[in-house]
Amino acid sequence: MSIRRDYLLRMIEQAARMLARVRELLVAGKTAEARAELERAAREAGLDLGIVLSLTPESLLPLLTNAGETDRPKCALFAELLYLERQRAIADGDTARAQRCAERAHFLFTLAYEGTTVDEETQDKISELL
């Protein structure tokens, strides 16, 4: 296995662990900790959640491209982060933020999976955001 492939697999595993941890925190009602984890993960992936939410989709798009191509894995990661941030905002009663998260997550899921077959779990998330 190549070094690049090993690195990518480690990054995927790390992201999966982080998403699972955030879900656990949300189930436990630890929304402040979940928010901190989400914000940390977003920064480590190269963008601040606040920026992702405040920019228009058109302004955000250049930050989600690599060599002129949509960075689908990055879009998928940020869609998942915003999906979980939406759940956190709902739990905290912040309906305005939850709505912004839903709109932006839907946009990012669309960018990430446009023209591809989407697994059932992801399709359920996308449908929930509409």
Model-found features: residue ranges?
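N-terminal alpha-helical interaction modules that lie
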Residues: 1-75, 103, 107-111, 128-130
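Short, solvent-exposed secondary-structure capping/transition elements
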Residues: 27-31, 89-95, 118
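Conserved small-residue packing positions in alpha-helical repeats and bundles
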Residues: 15, 22, 79-87, 93, ...
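Glycine-centered coil turns and helix-coil junctions that link the paired helices
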Residues: 48, 85-88, 92, 111-115
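Amphipathic alpha-helical binding modules
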Residues: 94-130
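Small-side-chain structural scaffolding
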Residues: 34, 41, 79, 86-89, ...
